[in-house]
């Protein structure tokens, strides 16, 4: 950068400044290329994540429908009378026991 101060003729100063300008333009072009590549990578990643989130949204929507139906059936069964309350309690205890047994076997399978 200080080479232009040592130049003897005005033509040499212009040549040195021109070379420095080209070098800086090349550096700028390489930085712009890297930024463009980075922006494209971010865009691709954002699109992938949006697709993933859309898939999760449809999964949660279907799960919500399934759980809503189960809760309605469970509520109907709970309101149906005293005879079914023993059955309901037995089913609840059975589901809890099944959950703990399943979690025990899954934890043993991982270790």
UniProtKB/Swiss-Prot annotation:
It is found in: Golgi apparatus membrane; Golgi apparatus, trans-Golgi network membrane. Gene3D superfamilies: 1.20.5.110. The lineage of its organism: Eukaryota, Metazoa, Chordata, Craniata, Vertebrata. CDD domains: SNARE_Bet1. InterPro entries: BET1_SNARE, T_SNARE_dom. The modification Phosphoserine is found at residues 9, 37. Keywords: Coiled coil, Golgi apparatus, Membrane, Phosphoprotein, Protein transport, Transmembrane, Transmembrane helix, Transport. It is a single-pass type IV membrane protein. Residues 15-77 form the t-SNARE coiled-coil homology domain. GO terms for biological process: protein transport. This is BET1-like protein. Residues 108-111 are lumenal. The chain crosses the membrane at residues 87-107. The keyword Magnesium does not apply. Residues 1-86 are cytoplasmic. Component of a SNARE complex consisting of STX5, YKT6, GOSR1 and BET1L. Interacts with STX5. GO terms for cellular component: Golgi membrane. It comes from Pongo abelii. Vesicle SNARE required for targeting and fusion of retrograde transport vesicles with the Golgi complex. Required for the integrity of the Golgi complex. The keyword Protein transport applies.
């Amino acid at each position: 950068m200080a080479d232009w101060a040592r130049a003897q003729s005005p033509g040499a100063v212009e040549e040195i400044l021109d070379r420095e300008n080209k070098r800086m333009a090349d550096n700028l072009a390489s930085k712009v290329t890297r930024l463009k590549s980075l922006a494209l990578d971010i865009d691709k990643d954002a699109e992938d994540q949006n697709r993933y989130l859309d898939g999760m949204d449809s999964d949660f929507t279907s799960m919500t429908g399934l759980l809503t139906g189960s809760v309605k059936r469970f509520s109907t069964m709970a309101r149906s009378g005293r005879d079914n309350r023993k059955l309901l309690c037995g089913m609840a205890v059975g589901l809890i026991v099944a959950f703990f047994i399943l979690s025990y076997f899954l934890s043993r399978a991982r270790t």
